[in-house]
Structures are given as structure tokens and as C-alpha cells.
Swiss-Prot record:
Subunit structure comment from the entry: Heterododecamer (2C3:3R2) of six catalytic PyrB chains organized as two trimers (C3), and six regulatory PyrI chains organized as three dimers (R2).
Documented EC number(s): 2.1.3.2
Pathway entry: Pyrimidine metabolism; UMP biosynthesis via de novo pathway; (S)-dihydroorotate from bicarbonate: step 2/3
InterPro entries for this protein: Asp/Orn_carbamoyltranf_P-bd, Asp/Orn_carbamoylTrfase, Asp/Orn_carbamoylTrfase_sf, Asp_carbamoyltransf, Asp_carbamoyltransf_Asp/Orn-bd
Record family assignment: Belongs to the aspartate/ornithine carbamoyltransferase superfamily. ATCase family.
The organism's taxonomic lineage, starting at the top: Bacteria, Bacillati, Bacillota, Clostridia, Eubacteriales
Enzyme class: transferase
Annotated protein name in UniProt: Aspartate carbamoyltransferase catalytic subunit
Species this chain originates from: Clostridium kluyveri (strain ATCC 8527 / DSM 555 / NBRC 12016 / NCIMB 10680 / K1)
Annotated function: Catalyzes the condensation of carbamoyl phosphate and aspartate to form carbamoyl aspartate and inorganic phosphate, the committed step in the de novo pyrimidine nucleotide biosynthesis pathway.
One biological process term in Gene Ontology: amino acid metabolic process
């Protein structure tokens, strides 16, 4: 039963509960009009302390398509946070107005704090470089829809593996399924955090670290590309030096299997050449559409409507 629950971490839900969400997502995809009034009278609060286009609009369009309404803010300067109000007090007040909340915050753990003080379900829409669980649900639904399975896959994660919260959530989630392995492709400065490697080791999940995309791409079922995130760098010189570390182009993808799929949480900067968009293995825009449907299903479940 997911009614009244929070989603803060990709591991908050069991595999069985995730399957419930994926099943409902597919029902919405196939019969969307039947769900167009299911959230009438419900209000989503979008509390975005950090800039976002895709995630915020995905949440908002999800609720609007379900017949509900949306309120919130898209930057801290337009909220009482600019006056020094705490997250705890903000969510207490929001709980008086809304039925469910989606929060993005630059500080790791902020949505967890909000959940502790909230009387309504809180969804983590990204906290610093930590977690992005609804993107993970999006990624899993995309993989399941295209590959037909979430196990026995070789997953390549490429780019910013240090600050990339989408990658952290994806690795944690996919490591729960049988016989998945990871190829972690990044420059030395942007390697995956040690705590994630310890988790993989504790589960006996196979992984390898490399700096070479060309030699790794041939054996992958999934290539998950990420951008180097300018907003996580304190030194502009370091960002400029690392931002072009990996660019997926025709030459590199020509070495990949015909049934490999390329995913990206977006926004893209230049890590995927535009010429790849027409390649049948490019699924990142379809992935974005799946994100709206999975958020529709998630909110229905957390609100206990179905």
C-alpha cells in the first residue's frame, strides 16, 4: 500500500511496489483519457529551490493531465526561503494547502527533512548530488518497456558520476535486479562516490571503472549518458577542462550493438551529438515522455486514489 508514503530515495519502494507503479503507468499510456479527471480536487505543490525545466514541468503536466491543480515556486527567491524560513516550517504550511508535494533542493537530505515534518506525501525531485528517485522510476520504466526486462543487463554510465544524482539513483535501483553489471566511464575527477562502490561490493554486483568510452561501448545493453554539471563546480577552470570529456558521436556509436539503447536524463549540453538523435538507439526523448506517465502513476498511488 503506497497511500500516504513519501518517495525520498530510490530504495524506498520494494520491487513489487515499483511493479505496481509501472503497471499503472502502462495503463495510463494506453488509456490516458480514462484518467483525465481522477485527481480533480487535488493540489500538487512544486517546491523548487533549484532551477529545473523538465522535472518541474513533468510533475506539473502530470497533475494537470490527471485533472488536478498545481501551485508552488520555481526558485527560492520567490519563496519565504529568501526570508530565512526553514524547510520544516515551509512544509508544515504547505501541508495545510496541498495534497502532495514535489521538492527539489540543492542541499542533500532536504526532502528527507521535509518528509519528517509533512502531513502530506513528499516526493524528492532531486537533492543536490544525492538522489533523483522519480528520474530513476522513469529510467526503469523506459528500460522495461524497450528491453522487456530489468535484469541480465550490462549498463554503462558515462560522464559525471561524482555529482550526477540520476546516476547514483539508477545504480542503486538496478543493482537490486538479478545479474546486472555496470561499466562506469568517467575521468578520474568525476568517479563514482566510494559509498556506492561499497554498496555494489556488499551485494556482489559486478562493476568496472574505465576512462575509455570507445572500448567499452561494444558490450553494453544500455548507455546512460550524463552531462558534466557546471553548477556543482566551484572552479570554472575545472569545469571547462572536463566538460568535453565524453561526446557520443556517430563514430563511437557505430561500435555499439544494434539493440543497445542510449538514455540521458537531460538537459543535454554537448555530450551527445545532435546527429545521434536520428539513430534508432536514441531513446532519451521517449524517456522524457515516460517520465510524465510514471509521475502520474506515482501521484495516484501516493494519494491513494487507486
Amino acid at each position: 500500500m503506497l497511500k500516504g508514503r513519501h518517495l525520498i530515495d530510490a530504495m524506498d519502494f520494494s520491487i513489487e511496489e515499483l511493479e505496481e507503479i509501472f503497471k499503472l503507468s502502462n495503463e495510463i499510456i494506453s488509456r490516458e483519457k480514462e484518467f483525465s479527471h481522477i485527481c480533480e480536487g487535488k493540489l500538487l505543490a512544486t517546491l523548487f529551490y533549484e532551477p529545473s525545466t523538465r522535472t518541474r514541468l513533468s510533475f506539473e503536466s502530470a497533475m494537470l493531465r490527471l485533472g488536478g491543480k498545481v501551485m508552488g515556486f520555481s526558485e527560492p527567491g520567490s519563496s519565504s526561503a529568501s526570508k530565512g524560513e526553514s524547510i520544516a516550517d515551509t512544509i508544515r504550511v504547505i501541508s495545510c494547502y496541498a495534497d502532495i508535494a514535489a521538492m527539489r533542493h540543492p542541499k542533500e537530505g532536504a526532502p528527507k527533512i521535509a518528509a519528517m515534518y509533512s502531513n502530506i506525501p513528499v516526493i524528492n525531485a532531486g537533492d543536490g548530488g544525492h538522489q533523483h528517485p522519480t528520474q530513476t522510476l522513469t529510467d526503469l520504466l523506459t528500460v522495461k518497456s524497450i528491453k522487456g526486462r530489468l535484469s541480465n543487463l550490462k549498463i554503462g554510465c558515462c560522464g559525471d558520476l561524482k555529482f550526477g544524482r540520476t546516476v547514483h539513483s539508477l545504480i542503486k535501483a538496478m543493482s537490486r535486479y538479478e545479474n546486472n553489471s555496470f561499466t562506469l566511464i568517467s575521468p578520474e575527477e568525476l568517479k563514482i562516490p566510494n559509498y556506492l562502490k561499497k554498496e555494489l561490493n556488499s551485494k556482489n554486483v559486478k562493476y568496472e571503472e574505465t576512462k575509455n568510452l570507445e572500448d567499452s561501448i561494444e558490450s553494453l545493453d544500455i548507455l546512460y549518458m550524463t552531462r558534466v554539471q557546471r553548477e556543482r563546480f566551484f572552479n570554472e577552470e575545472d569545469y571547462i577542462r572536463l566538460k568535453d570529456s565524453y561526446i557520443l558521436d556517430k563514430g563511437k556509436i557505430s561500435r555499439a550493438a544494434k539493440d543497445m539503447i542510449v538514455l540521458h536524463p537531460l538537459p543535454r549540453v554537448n555530450e551527445i551529438s545532435y546527429e545521434i538523435d536520428k539513430d534508432p538507439r536514441a531513446y532519451y526523448f521517449k524517456q522524457a515522455k515516460y517520465g510524465m506517465y510514471v509521475r502520474m502513476a506515482l501521484m495516484i498511488k501516493l494519494l491513494g486514489i487507486q
